[in-house]
Regions:
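Active-site glycine-rich loops that stabilize anionic/oxyanionic intermediates
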Residues: 26, 34-37, 226
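N-terminal cap/lid segment of alpha/beta-hydrolase-fold proteins
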Residues: 1-24
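Short alpha-helix in the alpha/beta-hydrolase fold that links the catalytic acid
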Residues: 232-243
């Protein structure tokens, strides 16, 4: 079971952290969760890492779980990246000398790719796991609606709308559990958070949101389920292809028939094969 801690104190409150501790770990994994969820939802995944002597940390992003901000307001992106940096620094202080991997799922995958690409922060990890990243959506937002959201991001950035996440298309019901009944989970996203995600996703895909070359040699694995009905698998295919073609150390794995939460599988899988792949990938670094 995890223990909670105060990762970072800011003017409005705190950023909550989670720790799945093991003594003298071989490696450390830091998790960035997706929209509407919270760090503790990765308990099942973290325990599998722990079994292989890998310590795990996570955070509640702004607007999520026990952290500050209105529900769904995971913005501005600059501050979100600073929170991720704080998580990595906490891991370094807790486990000095250990190799650290940054693992982001869904919106967390978008944020983690942004962190990888930005070149703005010097504390890069030794590897990246990108799970079903928000690069583009399966159902694109209509242009008139997106224009309105962009306007609201400027004049009322904390205004929220429904993220419309249906628990039935996330993964296996036995592992997803009663998603809508969990009080730590919500279905809100703010205008600024949405625009940040869409704009950065497009830039990551076409290369306009590019890095300064420092990330090219850092091992990165991008994984996506072919049956994802939330974040389009095509976005992952395209960004992986682009990065491989320019010589980055990127591996792409597509899981046939798995849903959005690939670590939770689909109706006939609990995602154990995905978790095993991640564990072995981290161990091999």
């Amino acid at each position: 079971m995890y223990e909670k801690f105060d990762l970072k104190k800011v003017e409005k409150g705190i950023i909550r952290g989670y720790l799945w501790h093991v003594e003298n770990p071989d490696k450390v994994v830091c998790i960035v969760h997706g929209i509407g969820e919270y760090g503790g939802r990765f308990d099942r995944v973290a325990k599998e890492f722990n079994r292989e002597n890998i310590a795990v940390l996570a955070l509640d992003l702004r607007g999520h779980g026990d952290s500050i901000e209105k529900k769904g307001h995971c913005a501005p992106r600059r501050e979100v990246l600073e929170d991720v940096s704080a998580l990595l620094e906490y891991a370094r202080q807790k486990y000095p000398g250990r190799r650290i991997v940054l693992y982001g799922h869904s919106m967390g995958g978008n944020i983690t790719l942004d962190y990888r690409a930005g070149g703005r922060l010097n504390d890069r990890p030794c590897g990246y796991i990108i799970s079903a990243p928000w690069i583009r959506l399966v159902r694109p937002v209509p242009k008139p609606l997106y224009a309105l959201v962009k306007l609201m991001a400027k004049i009322a950035p904390q205004m929220t709308i429904s993220s419309s996440v249906d628990e039935r298309i996330l993964g296996n019901p036995l592992t997803v559990k009663p998603y809508s009944e969990n009080p730590m989970v919500h279905n809100r996203i703010s205008a600024l958070c949405a625009v940040d995600g869409f704009e950065i996703g497009l830039g990551l895909e076409d290369g306009s949101h590019e890095d300064n070359g420092k990330a090219a040699k850092i091992p990165t694995i991008i994984m996506h389920g072919s049956a994802d009905r939330i974040c389009s698998v095509e976005g992952s295919r395209r960004i992986a292809k682009r990065l491989v073609e320019k010589g980055d150390a990127v591996e792409y794995v597509e899981w046939e028939g798995l849903y959005h939460e690939i670590h939770n599988g689909n109706d006939s899988s609990t995602g154990e094969e995905v978790i095993a792949k991640m564990v072995q990938w981290v161990k091999a670094l």
